[in-house]
Design a protein with these regions (language model features):
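HhH-family (HhH-GPD) DNA N-glycosylase catalytic core used in base-excision repair
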Residues: 3-186
């Protein structure tokens, strides 16, 4: 009994520390918080989650660069994406071609469907949410897809850690001071 109480107390302390608006400014969740329309929020969150590994200071710097390239309009950026706009943008394993590969797949998704929410909701309805999402990206990746692409879109079939995709999903479905809670299918 006391072990459970200690754990609950420790969790309560963490909630008080991190479940606050002040937490947003130093976290990748700051990027989807900058937008009002649902599709821009989900795209900003997805893009931020792709790059959220390594040094927090470094990936936030790179995300700021990327959102500058997107002129702070993620939906317009993706719907009209052309690889040349990336120039030499990269982050760790992710090279310009890797980002272009992902953004071209997102372009197809947003120009032919309702976007990420529809894709995740379909996967959820099939009880294979992450597998469906990953399969969508992998089935559309060209033969040019390299290590960086697979680093950003890990494969749960091969034991790939889905930590960043879970973080993105949490931002989209959970309501709170930090999480946006714009998806209701779960």
């Amino acid at each position: 009994y006391s072990i459970v109480m200690i754990t609950k107390n420790e969790l309560d302390v963490l909630v008080e520390k991190y479940e606050t608006v002040d937490f947003i400014k130093d976290d990748p969740v700051q990027f989807p918080h900058k937008f009002k329309d649902k599709k821009s929020i989900e795209l900003a969150g997805f893009i931020a989650s792709l790059v959220a590994y390594g040094s927090r200071q470094q990936f936030i710097k790179k995300l700021n660069e990327l959102f500058d390239l997107a002129e702070h309009e993620p939906l317009n950026f993706i719907q009209n994406f052309e690889p040349k706009i990336l120039g030499d943008f990269n982050y760790r394993f992710g090279k310009p071609d890797d980002f272009a590969e992902i953004f071209l797949i997102l372009k197809e998704l947003y120009n032919t469907s309702d976007g990420l929410e529809e894709l995740f909701a379909y996967g959820f309805s099939q009880e294979k949410m992450f597998e469906c999402v990953v399969d969508y990206f992998y089935s559309r990746a060209s033969e040019k897809a390299k290590q960086g692409f697979y680093q950003m879109i890990p494969n749960p079939h091969n034991g790939g850690a889905m930590k960043r995709m879970c973080m993105f999903l949490r931002w989209m479905v959970r309501k709170g001071p930090v999480d946006l809670g714009i998806w209701n299918f779960i």
